[in-house]
Amino acid sequence: MLETRCKYYENEAMFHGFIPHIMGTRFDILLIHSDIDRLNTLWADIAYELERLDKILNRFDPHSEVSKINNHASQSKIQISKEMKSILQLCSYYYETTSHLFDITLKDFSQIQLHEHSYISFTSPDISLDFGGFAKGYALKKIRKFIEQENISDAFANFGNSSILGIGHHPYGDCWKVSFLNPYNQSL
């Protein structure tokens, strides 16, 4: 069972949802709206979706779909879900358009074989899938759709300070302010 927390700040019409451990990090979201019931429902949908995606993409969970692929695809063709097939096709597109810099195999994406009827195999036993550089961004795109479907115009989501989504405005300003350290000068 996924541990989640949330709190509504009535004066600001701000909802804060928090998951301490999902996809290898923490997740926070701020949703600005006055309808608390609507926000609670949206939060439940978001938390459910994050847990669902974690069960597909978390290579550290031995029961996840990616773990099953990593454990068996070098030995024989195995069937994958339609969503996993779509994710792999998207990752293949990123692999090609980045001149092979984006590679979820950490070796050579070309050694993944996608077969008809949603089957996958690896041509080498050294290949495994790691969605660490992909899963949080993919999840944020899904979350954005949930937020837009509810016509929430102001929201901010943060995955462990490495992947963020800002929509609209902060309740006390023109935008959601973000900052990050300059890796070449930590004093800035």
Please provide the spans of the model-predicted regions.
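Mature catalytic core of soluble alpha/beta enzymes
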Residues: 1-188
